[in-house]
Amino acid sequence: MTNLNEKQLITEIVGLARSQGLTVHSENAQLNETGMDFQVVFAKDDTGMPWVLRKPRRSDVVERASAEGITLAFLRANLTADVPDWRIHTPELIAYPMLKGTPAAGIDLEQKQYVWNMDHQPPSDDFVRTLADILAELHGTDQISAGQSGIEVIRPEDFRQMTADSMVDVKNKLGVSTTLWERWQKWVDDDAYWPGFSSLIHGDLHPPHILIDQNGRVTGLLDWTEAKVADPAKDFVLYQTIFGEKETARLLEYYDQAGGRIWAKMQEHISEMQAAYPVEIAKLALQTQQEEHINMALEALGVTSD
């Protein structure tokens, strides 16, 4: 994107905020294009307070954002970690005061890799322990209250069936390698892997969504678009993809100590869910229909596009 286009987009998004009565300014505002669902501008108001302005990229994002708003209202009353406090929520714009802390990593779009704001090889004990504490608290949240607040609740048997159905759908529409398909089916068919309970999960837990303080302790979580009551293993999949099995075992140990609910094959289940992550990539690609996303999905599925 050229500087001119960036300026125009910043002006547009700041204009949307100002039309809602938020006195933010485009001077020194910054654009962040790394998210797949939102274009984001960071801008300050008359008092110097920094704000996050999110403009949905697609209509399906607008629909899911209303669910995210319900989730955040529930979390602000039930989770000690910091979460966004939406002050503006319209189909065109979401705005909230920027939270304290720094994302554990940003994303370099050109290099397609993380730009870290912390020591991550390996992550510090403070980071792992505080993340485990927050996950244990989140996953231990009362499900009945969550459901009554309007958060989607998926029973364990339904989550498993939905996973199997998604695999079939992706295979029919995009294809999948035989090796991957056989692995998925063994996992879906084996009761030993699957938990008999669901938990309130973040659903898209990776470094840009994790806020840390100057000592590397986790203080808050961003971007709750995928939150629901579902399989708790999902909140460990991206962590294991990035940091590996050994570090995930350390996180699970602290999670257990913090009161998180563990089962015998939990880490093996995480590994199998990780192997099925191409399904998530494919679902996004089928939703956006963008060539870049389709190609990414085909590669992850082990399908050659001729």
UniProtKB/Swiss-Prot annotation:
Cross-referenced InterPro entries: AGP_Transferase (IPR051678), Aminoglycoside_PTrfase (IPR002575), Kinase-like_dom_sf (IPR011009)
Molecular functions (GO terms): ATP binding; kinase activity
SUPFAM superfamilies with a match to the protein in the record: Protein kinase-like (PK-like)
Entry annotation: catalytic residues: D204 (proton acceptor)
Transmembrane segments: none
Alphabetical keyword list: ATP-binding, Kinase, Nucleotide-binding, Transferase
Cytoplasm recorded as keyword: no
UniProt family annotation: Belongs to the aminoglycoside phosphotransferase family.
Listed name of the protein: Uncharacterized protein YcbJ
Organism field: Bacillus subtilis (strain 168)
